[in-house]
Amino acid sequence: GREIDYMRISITDRCNLRCKYCMPDGIQCMPRWEILSLEELEAIAVCAADLGIRKIKVTGGEPLVRRDCPQLVRMLKNVPGIEKVTLTTNGVLLEQYLGELLNAGLDAVNISLDTLDPGLYETITGADALDKVLGIISRADRLPIPVKVNAVSIDFDNWKDGKERDKNGWRAMAALAEQYPVDVRFIEMMPIGYGKQFQGIDHRTLLLQLKEMYPDLETDHEVHGFGPAVYYKSQRFKGSIGLISAIHGKFCSSCNRVRLTAQGYLKTCLCYEDGVDLKQVLREEISRPEKESHFIWPEGLDVRDEGLQSRLRTVMEKTILKKPMAHCFETPGRITES
């Protein structure tokens, strides 16, 4: 069977960008009191480690809009059994928090970036911030932790905004692996959320085009992380190129992860809404008047309380054991995740 040893923890549903396929303008965010506190996240991490989780990825939204993100990284690094804590960010605030994150023990960072074209970047994200992101990537060889760049494989030429697009914009993204010691990973668009409205690029086609661009491209069997990417190397690379092909390279049989939403919902697959509300377990003893008064976060939570850990363990273990064997993205009618 699969060894589930990796948890993605979303610490906020807010973001400082408005990417059209993810969080476009007008999207409603949850009230802050609905989001898990640091202590609640720590309690879940302690239990997750007891259940075999060894690696944690901190995500959002944009995790760095939450100013206590470095503090959380430090807390997670101190949880017995947790071996690696990494971060996925859009990179806009990374320069501001990088020192704190490194001091907290962050092991690696993934930067989400879909284009190197300033105009297209602003069209996608609603922000003029590309230079900030590229500033961090350009220093990758001087950073003490590995840097990966995540690009969603979108057919921007099909965007219905009346502008002509560079059909080969992915080439500039791929070339980052020539310029810097970074892993550039192309991620197939999944038909969920706002992503359903956009046309993705088939990774079978993308791989053929990459091989034309780099005739000596070959599979790189070196371990680059904990995820499902298939990596490729070339003599021209300082880094590597990875393909995460959820649709045309289904990797469910080796999927090793579960996901915790910012509201405390533990999910086992992006394709299905099934899961369990851990926030309900964490806050079950808080009175209804307190809940309705929109308190910020419960105070004085003992994250290692045996009773709390026992209740969390029971529901988390049951949920993880029911992780689906495979997604159903190829049959959209069966998808239950909105």
What feature does the model see in each segment?
Residues 2-6, 172, 178-179, 189-338:
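Auxiliary Fe-S-binding modules of radical SAM enzymes
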Residues 17, 118-119, 250, 276:
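Glycine-centered loop/turn positions within well-structured domains
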Residues 18, 22, 66, 119, ...:
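Residues that scaffold the ATP/ADP-binding catalytic core of kinase and kinase-like folds
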Residues 2-38, 50-51:
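Canonical Radical SAM [4Fe-4S] cluster-binding loop centered on the CxxxCxxC motif
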Residues 38-58, 62-183:
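Radical SAM/AdoMet-radical enzyme domain recognition
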Residues 27-31, 117-124, 193-197, 277-278:
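A short acidic, helix-capping loop that chelates divalent metal ions and anchors anionic groups
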Residues 6, 10, 57, 88, ...:
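Conserved beta-strand segments that form the floor/walls of ligand-binding pockets within enzyme
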